UniProtKB/Swiss-Prot annotation:
Primary enzyme class: hydrolase
Keywords linked to the UniProt accession: Hydrolase, Nuclease, Secreted, Signal
SUPFAM superfamilies the record matches: His-Me finger endonucleases
Protein's gene: bsn
Signal sequence range: 1-24
Protein origin, superkingdom: Bacteria
Biological role: Mg(2+)-activated ribonuclease which hydrolyzes RNA apparently nonspecifically into oligonucleotides with 5'-terminal phosphate.
Transmembrane segment boundaries: none
Protein name: Extracellular ribonuclease
Keyword Secreted set for record: yes
GO cellular component: extracellular region
Alphabetized PANTHER family for the sequence: ENDONUCLEASE-1 (PTHR33607:SF2)
Region (Disordered): 177-197
Enzyme Commission number, as recorded: 3.1.-.-
Length: 289
C-alpha cells in the first residue's frame, strides 16, 4: 500500500499551489517570441515555426488560394503560371529600398540593426551608405546582368535586394554564383575566384531562391529584360545568372528558414504585395528547372 500511494504528496502539492493547463483558445503559444504565424497551407491550419524575432507575424495570405493558378502544373506551364501570379507588384523607388531593407532584414535581437547578407553581421541601420564600414543595397541578381540598373522594377525589387557590407558587396561585384575559390578575408565562409562567388552555407539557399524568383518574375513581356538562369559563370552583361545546377543543390542544402518566411511575409504585406513562390514552395525549383 505504501508503494502505491507514493504519488499522493505530489498531487496534493498541485492542488495547494494551483495549476492551470495551457488554454487551447488562447491562440498564440505562451512563449510568443519564439514563433511566427506564417502562411502555410496545411490540413490542420496554421503551422508555427521557430522564430527569433519578438514580433508575431500573422498570415496575410492563404497560399493555397494565392497559388491556385499554379496547382497541378510543372515545367514551363508552372513557370508561366507563377509569373502571372507574382507580376503587377507595387514597385519601389531606389531610395525607398533603404527603409524597406531596414524592416525586412532587421536584426531580431536588436531592432536598431540589420543583418548583412554575406557576413550575417549585425550592423546599425543608421550605417547605410557608401563608405567603408557602411552597408549598402546588394543586388543578388547583379544589375549588370541584363543592364536594368536601379530604375523601378528589377533594380528595386526587394525580393532580391539585401543589406551587405560595402566592401564585401564590391568584392562580389557582378559575379555569378558557384562553388570554390579562395576565402574572402572580410567575409569568412565566402569564397570567390575570377568569375564566381560562393556565399556562406547559412545563406546559400536564400541566394538560390532569390534568383529563382527573379527568373520567373521577369520574363521580358513588360518592358523589363527576360532574366534567365543558365549553367554557366562569367555571363557578363547578358540577362543570365548561373550556375543553375549549383543553385538547385543549394536550395536543398540550405532549406527555407523562419527568417526567410518572415521576410517574404513583410514584403507581401507592407511593400510589394507579391510573394517569392520558392520560399513558400521550394520544391517548385526542381519542377521548373
Amino acid at each position: 500500500m505504501t508503494k502505491k500511494l507514493w504519488f499522493l504528496p505530489i498531487v496534493c502539492l498541485f492542488f495547494i499551489l494551483g495549476w492551470t493547463a495551457p488554454s487551447a483558445s488562447a491562440g498564440a503559444p505562451a512563449d510568443t517570441n519564439l514563433y511566427s504565424r506564417l502562411a502555410v497551407s496545411t490540413a490542420g491550419g496554421t503551422t508555427l515555426f521557430p522564430q527569433t524575432s519578438s514580433a508575431v507575424i500573422t498570415p496575410s495570405a492563404d497560399t493555397e488560394t494565392y497559388y491556385k493558378e499554379a496547382s497541378g502544373k510543372s515545367g514551363t506551364a508552372l513557370k508561366s503560371a507563377l509569373h502571372r501570379i507574382i507580376s503587377g507588384h507595387t514597385k519601389l523607388s531606389y531610395s525607398q529600398v533603404w527603409n524597406a531593407l531596414k524592416e525586412t532584414d532587421e536584426d531580431p535581437a536588436n531592432p536598431n540593426n540589420v543583418i548583412l547578407l554575406y557576413t550575417q553581421e549585425s550592423r546599425a541601420k543608421s550605417k547605410n551608405g557608401g563608405s567603408v564600414g557602411d552597408w549598402n543595397r546588394e543586388h543578388v541578381w547583379a544589375k549588370s546582368h541584363g543592364n536594368f540598373g536601379t530604375a523601378a522594377g528589377p533594380g528595386t525589387d526587394i525580393h532580391h535586394l539585401r543589406p551587405a557590407d560595402v566592401q564585401v558587396n564590391s568584392a562580389r561585384g557582378n559575379m555569378d554564383f558557384d562553388n570554390g575559390g579562395s576565402e574572402y578575408p572580410k567575409a569568412p565562409g565566402n569564397y570567390y575566384d575570377g568569375d564566381s562567388w560562393e556565399p556562406r552555407d547559412e545563406v546559400k539557399g536564400d541566394v538560390a531562391r532569390m534568383l529563382f524568383y527573379m527568373a520567373v518574375r521577369y520574363e521580358g513581356g513588360d518592358g523589363y529584360p527576360d532574366l534567365e538562369l543558365n549553367d554557366k559563370t562569367g555571363n557578363g552583361s547578358a540577362p543570365y545568372m548561373g550556375k543553375l545546377s549549383v543553385l538547385l543543390k543549394w536550395n536543398k542544402q540550405d532549406p527555407v528558414d523562419s527568417k526567410e518566411k518572415r521576410r517574404n511575409e513583410i514584403i507581401y504585406e507592407d511593400y510589394q504585395h507579391n510573394r517569392n513562390p520558392f520560399i513558400d514552395h521550394p520544391e517548385w525549383a526542381d519542377e521548373i528547372w
